[in-house]
């Protein structure tokens, strides 16, 4: 993990309360509450994939759209083998270092901080670190239980979104009652998503000091804010407030409220990923 994170990392213990099977998770995890878990030779790859997780897919509920969120590290020479998921979607969002991402068409791309990748159901992907620095990335797994999996085969979608090709879309008074401007750079947005896709939107967002996203909820979508830089205050559906900083993970499932305010003196930068499981029942 990057040195900037190292001083803040605390090794936590895997407890049943944290990863209880089928139990609804909370809405906010600070860096000290992430759980460390290493995997070896993932998908036929090589070396250790080090992970620090808010929650893992093995304990997700059927109705959850976002099944897993983790900060992952590959050291020099380590790689995740080329593989595919039958019904999950898997996004790798590069935070630091340089790697090689391989897509389902056997294209290989050099990936750097700010680049975003995704594999929809049935699409192949792999990731390798051939540089001397650690390759650090977010790994977010989601599932739409009502997806027509055959539709993905007949209509493959792009998998690689370089940082310099992300498109801008800014929002005033985000969440309806927010203050200032929410600046966004997007790989894709929910307006163009299909009913089969679980991950509807991925954006790199910025709130200037004092600006905010107002308290709001999504009727059907799940929305995660994953903090990369700066300091802010996250408000959950019960009105609880949390101080969040780098490597804090927040989420609001369908029907839950959430809000975010930049309470620091520097830009608050975060990933905003929206997903939906159309099979979920109210």
Predicted region positions:
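Short beta-strand segments in beta-sandwich/barrel cores
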Residues: 78-80, 97-102, 211-213, 230-235
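Glycine- and acidic-residue-biased ligand/ion/polar-headgroup-sensing regions
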Residues: 87-99, 220-232
């Amino acid at each position: 993990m990057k040195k900037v994170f190292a001083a803040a990392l605390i090794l936590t213990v895997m407890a049943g309360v944290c990863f209880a099977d089928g139990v609804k998770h909370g809405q906010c995890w600070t860096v000290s509450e992430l759980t460390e878990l290493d995997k070896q030779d993932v998908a036929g790859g090589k070396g250790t994939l080090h992970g620090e997780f808010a929650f893992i897919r093995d304990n997700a509920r059927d109705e959850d759209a976002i099944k897993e969120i983790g900060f992952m590290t590959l050291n020099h020479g380590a790689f995740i083998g080329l593989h595919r998921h039958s019904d999950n979607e898997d996004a790798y969002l590069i935070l630091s270092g340089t790697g090689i991402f391989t897509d389902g068409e056997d294209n290989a791309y050099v990936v750097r901080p700010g680049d975003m990748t995704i594999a929809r159901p049935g699409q192949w992907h792999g990731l390798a670190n051939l540089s001397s620095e650690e390759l650090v990335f977010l790994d977010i797994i989601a599932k739409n239980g009502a997806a027509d999996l055959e539709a993905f085969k007949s209509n493959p979608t792009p998998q690689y979104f370089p940082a310099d090709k992300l498109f801008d879309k800014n929002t005033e008074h985000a969440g309806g009652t927010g203050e200032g401007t929410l600046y966004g750079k997007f790989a894709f947005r929910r307006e163009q998503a299909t009913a089969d896709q679980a991950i509807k939107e991925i954006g790199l967002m910025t709130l200037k000091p004092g600006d905010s996203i107002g308290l709001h909820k999504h009727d059907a979508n799940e929305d995660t804010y994953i903090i990369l830089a700066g300091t802010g205050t996250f408000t959950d559906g019960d009105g609880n407030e949390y101080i969040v900083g780098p490597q804090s993970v927040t989420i609001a499932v369908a029907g839950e409220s959430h809000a975010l305010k930049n309470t620091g003196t520097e830009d608050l930068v975060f990933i905003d990923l929206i997903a939906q499981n159309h099979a979920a029942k109210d």
